[in-house]
Amino acid sequence: ATFDKSSFPIVKVVFEEGPNSDEEFDNFTNEWLELYNQKIKFTFLFDTINMRNPAYKYTIKMSQFIKRLKREEIQYLEKSIILINTNKIKYMLDFIFLIQKPVAPVYIYNINNGPTSSIYEIMAHSETTSISP
């Protein structure tokens, strides 16, 4: 995953296929923890559009990571916006949040209708799922 902090406090995270290894997953969670170490509130914008075939084992690892995050005294993540375009990713997210509720509100936007020009267009014209902590 690539973390783009140029619009901080909005942090865009773009996934290209993976994670495909434990090392990639660990890099992802370490970047997330670095944001917490800054002790500044932020919002994630996850772009999973290019994610094709992530391994199911990372759903369990992600739920364990969320559980670990919940032990933090202060939650710096204010909300997550997740862009998806496949049912597989949606099912994996549903499974993660069934096992472990999120640390902050999550908004999932299914953008099956192709690329859009802005996040505002996505939010206005996409099917949305909301998950509360």
Question: Can you describe what each PLM-predicted range is?
Answer:
Residues 1-133:
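Amphipathic, Lys/Arg-enriched alpha-helical "gate/interface" segment within cytosolic domains
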